Amino acid sequence: GKTTLLRTLLGLITQDRGEIVWLDDAGKYHNYRTFECLYQGHQLGIKNLLTVFENLNITKHAKGMSQEDIYKHLERVGLSNVNELASNISVGQRKRIAMAKWLLKEFKIYFIDEPFSALDDTATLLIEKLIKELNAKGCSFVITGHRPSGIEATRVEI
């Protein structure tokens, strides 16, 4: 249900009934594709045969970004083993690569499926901090999960 909801909101799955209406700040209708959004599902998009650095560097939002900036984003999420193959790192470290992708560009809306699963307390606190920082800059989050976190909704829409 939770993953299906996110995928339906993004148009990746067609709903059987009802409609999804996206409105901008002025109340004008838009297609979800007109909003700059990031979707992170269960599959993190991490390539096993690439290094930690290469996994971030190959994303479309890293194009034109200096290596130094990419290293800073990896460092910000606690990854210093940038030359390690992704096949040799833990699930938690793979999720940190995914978190670094959040930092490449400030998206209007982040759709994140189960960001807290398989993480230790340190990584959980890091995600909470990143979400709060990005939210303070005007970014919105739609998050699914099984376990509660230290993040409180600032606005709930039904």
Q: Which positions does each model-derived feature cover?
A:
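Helix-to-loop junction immediately C-terminal to a conserved catalytic motif
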Residues: L10
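Conserved ABC transporter NBD signature motif
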Residues: Q15-F35
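Q-loop/switch helix immediately C-terminal to the Walker
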Residues: Q43, N48-G64
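Conserved ABC ATPase "signature" region
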Residues: Q67-V82
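Conserved ABC ATPase signature
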Residues: L85-R94
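Hydrophobic anchor residue at the start of the ABC signature
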Residues: M99
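Catalytic Walker B motif of ABC-type/P-loop ATPase nucleotide-binding domains
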Residues: Y110-E114
